[in-house]
Amino acid sequence: MPKSFSPIPMPKRSGEPDPEDNDEDDDEDGMMKSVEYICGLIDKEVEAGVPIERIVVGGFSQGCAISLLVGLVSRYSGKLGGVVGLSGYLPLGEKVGKMMEERKEREKNTAQTKWFLAHGARDQLVPKREFMRYQDKIEGWEGERVEVKLYEGMGHATVGAEVRDLYGWLEKTLPEIQA
């Protein structure tokens, strides 16, 4: 049973451990089933003839969390055209890094995936510090392929500027198909 409705576990009293490394509240099995479901949708698109480098997955809030996992630890890690994460968080704590290492040992990853990470500086559901924490991790893993936007005054929502920035990123990431 979760301790709170927040996707980010929060300590109850000072002196308790930092929730950054507390992944026991995350439903790893459920999340990985969601990742596999998204991979099944990608499979169908690839079977229909869509080039993998033209497929972008993305989500807002919990959808962001699952999209980040698809981009980092699924069988499509490094192969997608892009991953979009809006106002979300990176679940499973330190397990993600371990899962990535296991995947790299099994497969040669020629990582081409581009990333768009955006967040509201006034988000009270997923605090800015949590965004900065996972942004640093993803930039460390994915390097210069990560574009980051922080919107002052925006809470756990989207604003026109974010949508415009995402649109511009998609235009750069997915150039027109040459007929």
What are these regions (language model features)?
Residues 1-52:
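Serine-hydrolase catalytic machinery in alpha/beta-hydrolase-like enzymes
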Residues 10-24, 74-78, 99-111:
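Intrinsically disordered, low-complexity coil segments
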Residues 25-32, 61, 125, 157-160:
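Intrinsic disorder
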Residues 33, 37, 65-66, 130-133, ...:
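Acidic, Ser/Thr-rich intrinsically disordered and amphipathic helical segments
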Residues 40-45, 73, 137-138, 169:
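A generic secondary-structure signal
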Residues 46-50, 72-76, 108-109, 171, ...:
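Residue-level signal for alpha-helix termini/capping positions
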Residues 48-102:
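Primarily recognizes the serine-hydrolase "nucleophile elbow" in alpha/beta-hydrolase
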